[in-house]
């Protein structure tokens, strides 16, 4: 299981962006991320075409299967979910379709129950909710 955002485990810095201009102000080793909203498909395409490491975060509590597959066409490093049910379903899709993107669940790292749910459902990894600042 990947563990991102833990203070003792080194990982890349995640930078929230809203447009291509913000991509240019990030460092090469940063991972930019943005909301998995249809209006951001162009941003995903831009990142893919320009070799920018990016992730998408799914903020809605409803399953958005179409958005999940559309964004995965642009090969994000991570698909991040705030809703565990969505993360579990996305992990099933990622496994069945051999997607390159890793599925992450955003959680409080002190939440023992969430760790157990993620392990039981073989989620690729977790990311500290404190690592993800939405502006």
Question: Where do the PLM segments sit?
Answer:
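Conserved N-terminal beta1-alpha1 strand-loop-helix module at the mouth
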Residues: 1-77
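Structural signal for conserved beta-strand scaffold positions within catalytic alpha/beta enzyme cores
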Residues: 5, 16, 105-106, 127
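Residue-level signal for glycine
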Residues: 75, 101-102
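Catalytic cores of alpha/beta
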Residues: 65-71, 84-93, 110-134
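Glycine-rich beta-to-alpha transition loops that act as phosphate-gripper elements at the mouths
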Residues: 36-38, 56-63, 79-84, 103-112, ...
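Generic hydrophobic/packing signal
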Residues: 53, 75, 95, 122-123
């Amino acid at each position: 299981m990947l563990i991102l955002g833990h203070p003792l485990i080194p990982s890349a810095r995640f930078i929230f962006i809203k447009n291509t201009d913000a991509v240019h102000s990030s460092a090469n080793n940063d991972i930019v991320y943005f909301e998995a909203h249809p209006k951001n498909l162009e941003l995903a395409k831009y990142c893919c075409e320009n070799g920018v490491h990016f992730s998408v975060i799914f903020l809605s509590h409803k399953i958005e299967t179409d958005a999940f597959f559309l964004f995965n066409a642009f090969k994000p490093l991570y698909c991040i979910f705030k809703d565990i049910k969505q993360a579990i379903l996305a992990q099933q899709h990622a496994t069945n379709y051999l997607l390159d993107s890793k599925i992450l669940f955003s959680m409080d790292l002190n939440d023992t129950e969430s760790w157990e749910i993620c392990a039981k459902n073989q989620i690729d990894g977790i990311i500290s909710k404190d690592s993800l600042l939405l502006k």
